[in-house]
C-alpha cells in the first residue's frame, strides 16, 4: 500500500496514490477506509439505460463519505441519485497483497446499498487481514428492466454491466490499497448471491475473480429476453407513458419512488425485477451454463440459513414478496399426487409450525442452490454452510434463522440498530461473537487458500452448520432432495432460455 499517512491513530486522514490519482480516506483503529469512490461516470442524462463508462481522471478524490445510493424506494433514508456507481474499501494500515472480498449487496434487485452498516468492513478487516470492497449498482427500473425494444439507446442488464465495471476497477486499482488483484473473492447475498452465481459464466467478469461465496442467492432468478421486455412494457403502462422520450424524461426520484408500487401492480412482488438472458451480456441461465460446464472453474462456498423464508409469515412481507404468486408458480405445474407427496414429507420431517416455512425456503432458495452446487461440483470444488443460530427474541417472533441473518456474523456487525434488538444479554452477545469469529475464520481461510476443512459437496451434501454448537450435517435431507428432482420445476430450471418461452425460474 503506497500510503501517505498523517497518522495511523483513530479518525486521521490517509492518502494513497493509484493510477496518478490521490485517494484521501480515513484511518481508524488501524483500519483504513475509502468511501464513495466513483468507479464509473454518472448515469444521469445521457448515461441512463446505457453501459457504465470509465470516469474522467482527476488529481484527487476525497473518499471520506459514502456516495449516493442508486434510486429506489424512499424508505432508504440516504442520498439517492443516478451518480451512484461508487464503491467502498477497507484495508489494514500497511496491508500488502491481501486477499480481497468483493461484496455485492442484495435487495431483490430493487433496493439496497453497499454502504449499509451491516456490510461495514471495519470489524472483519480488523479480525482477518483481508481487504473488503462493497459496491453500488443500478437497481430496479434503471438497472434491470429491458427497454431495448425502444431502440439501441437502451441497454438491458445495466446492473450486471455495473458489477463487471466495478470488478474491473477493483482488479486494476486494489493493489494500491493493499489488496491482491490475483486473489479476488466475489460474495453476495440474496439478489447479490444470484449475481455471484452468474459471474463465473460471464467472461467479462470471470477473468477478475478467483473464488466465490453465494449466500442465499437464487440461480434460477433470471428471465428470458421476452419476459424482461414484457415487464418493461408493463412498467411504461403503469407510469402512463408510451415513448422513449417520456421514459427518459421521468425524474430519477419518481422512478425510485415507483419501484415498490410497481411490484404491487404486477402482483409479482419481489419477482418483478430479475436480470434477463439477452444473448450478449447474459448468454443463458446460470444453471444451464454451469450444467454445460461453460463457466470458470473456481472454488465455491455456498450457504443458506436454516429458516430462510420465515419472515414471510408476516403478512406485510408476504405481500411484498408476492408469496402467493411464488407458491402458485412453484407448484402449479406439478401433478396433484406429487404435490401431496411433497407436502406429506415436509409434515413428517418437520414440526407442524415449521413444515411450511421449510417448504417455502427449499422451493424459493435452497433447492435451486443445491441444483447449482450439484452441477458445479462436477468440475470444481464446492462447500456448503448453513446458519442455524437464532436468538430467543428471533424464536419468539417466529423469524428464527431468517434470510440474511448470517450477514452480521460474516462482517462482525451486531450493534447497529436494525440488528441490536435481536441479541439480548451477555450470554447471547458472547455466543454471536464466538460464532462470528468461526465463520470469519472460515471465510478468510477460503479466500486465502480456496479450500475449507470439511468435505466438499457430495451425494450427502454435508455442510458446516453454525449454531450454539458447530455441526456437520446434510444441508437438506436426501428424501426431500429426491422429491424436488422429480418436479417439473427442476426440469424447466435446466431448459435453455433459447429453447423455451417458459420461465426457467421459481419466481
Q: Where are the language model's segments positioned?
A:
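Serine-hydrolase-like catalytic core of hydrolytic proteins
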Residues: 74-244, 261, 290-313
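Non-transmembrane alpha-helical segments in soluble domains
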Residues: 101, 164-167, 171, 197, ...
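Short, solvent-exposed turn/loop segments enriched in Gly/Ser/Thr/Pro and often Arg
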Residues: 138-140, 190-191, 386-391, 458-468
Amino acid at each position: 500500500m503506497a500510503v501517505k499517512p498523517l497518522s495511523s491513530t483513530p479518525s486521521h486522514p490517509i492518502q494513497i496514490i493509484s493510477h496518478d490519482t490521490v485517494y484521501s480516506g480515513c484511518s481508524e483503529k488501524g483500519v483504513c477506509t475509502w468511501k464513495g469512490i466513483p468507479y464509473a461516470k454518472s448515469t444521469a442524462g445521457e448515461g441512463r439505460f446505457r453501459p457504465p463508462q470509465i470516469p474522467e481522471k482527476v488529481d484527487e478524490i476525497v473518499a471520506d463519505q459514502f456516495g449516493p445510493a442508486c434510486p429506489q424506494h424512499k424508505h432508504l433514508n440516504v442520498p439517492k441519485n443516478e451518480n451512484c456507481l461508487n464503491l467502498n474499501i477497507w484495508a489494514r494500515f500497511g496491508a500488502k497483497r491481501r486477499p480481497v472480498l468483493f461484496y455485492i449487496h442484495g435487495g431483490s434487485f430493487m433496493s439496497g446499498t453497499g454502504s449499509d452498516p451491516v456490510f461495514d468492513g471495519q470489524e472483519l478487516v480488523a479480525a482477518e487481514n483481508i481487504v473488503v470492497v462493497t459496491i453500488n449498482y443500478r437497481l430496479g427500473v434503471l438497472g434491470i428492466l429491458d427497454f431495448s425494444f425502444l431502440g439501441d439507446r437502451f441497454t438491458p442488464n445495466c446492473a450486471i454491466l455495473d458489477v463487471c465495471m466495478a470488478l474491473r476497477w477493483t482488479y486494476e486499482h486494489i493493489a494500491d490499497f493493499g489488496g491482491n488483484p490475483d486473489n479476488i473473492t466475489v460474495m453476495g447475498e440474496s439478489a447479490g448471491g444470484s449475481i455471484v452465481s452468474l459471474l463465473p459464466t460471464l467472461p467479462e467478469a470471470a477473468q477478475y475473480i478467483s473464488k466465490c461465496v453465494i449466500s442465499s442467492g437464487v440461480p434460477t432468478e433470471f428471465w428470458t429476453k421476452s419476459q424482461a421486455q414484457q415487464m418493461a412494457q408493463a412498467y411504461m403502462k403503469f407510469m402512463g407513458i408510451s415513448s422513449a422520450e417520456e421514459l427518459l424524461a421521468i425524474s430519477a426520484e419518481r422512478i425510485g419512488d415507483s419501484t415498490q408500487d410497481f411490484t404491487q401492480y404486477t402482483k409479482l412482488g419481489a419477482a418483478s425485477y430479475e436480470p434477463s438472458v439477452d444473448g450478449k451480456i447474459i448468454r443463458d441461465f446460470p444453471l444451464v451454463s454451469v450444467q454445460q460446464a461453460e463457466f470458470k472453474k473456481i472454488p465455491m462456498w455456498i450457504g443458506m440459513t436454516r429458516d430462510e423464508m420465515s419472515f414471510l409469515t408476516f403478512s406485510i412481507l408476504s405481500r411484498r414478496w408476492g408469496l402467493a404468486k411464488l407458491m402458485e408458480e412453484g407448484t402449479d405445474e406439478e401433478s396433484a399426487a406429487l404435490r401431496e407427496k411433497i407436502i406429506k414429507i415436509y409434515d413428517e420431517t418437520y414440526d407442524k409450525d415449521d413444515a411450511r416455512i421449510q417448504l417455502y425456503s427449499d422451493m424459493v432458495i435452497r433447492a435451486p442452490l443445491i441444483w447449482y452446487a450439484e452441477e458445479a461440483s462436477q468440475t470444481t470444488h464446492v462447500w456448503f454452510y448453513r446458519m442455524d443460530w437464532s436468538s430467543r427474541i428471533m424464536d419468539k417472533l417466529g423469524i428464527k434463522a431468517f434470510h440474511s441473518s448470517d450477514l452480521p456474523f460474516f462482517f462482525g456487525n451486531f450493534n447497529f440498530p436494525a440488528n441490536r434488538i435481536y441479541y439480548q444479554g451477555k450470554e447471547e452477545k458472547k455466543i454471536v461473537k464466538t460464532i462470528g469469529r468461526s465463520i470469519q475464520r472460515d471465510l478468510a481461510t477460503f479466500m486465502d487458500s480456496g479450500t475449507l476443512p470439511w468435505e466438499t459437496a457430495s451425494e450427502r451434501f454435508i455442510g458446516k452448520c453454525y449454531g450454539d454448537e458447530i455441526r456437520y450435517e446434510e444441508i437438506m435431507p436426501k428424501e426431500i432432495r429426491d422429491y424436488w428432482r422429480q418436479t417439473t420445476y427442476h426440469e424447466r430450471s435446466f431448459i435453455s432460455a433459447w429453447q423455451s418461452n417458459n420461465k426457467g425460474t421459481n419466481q
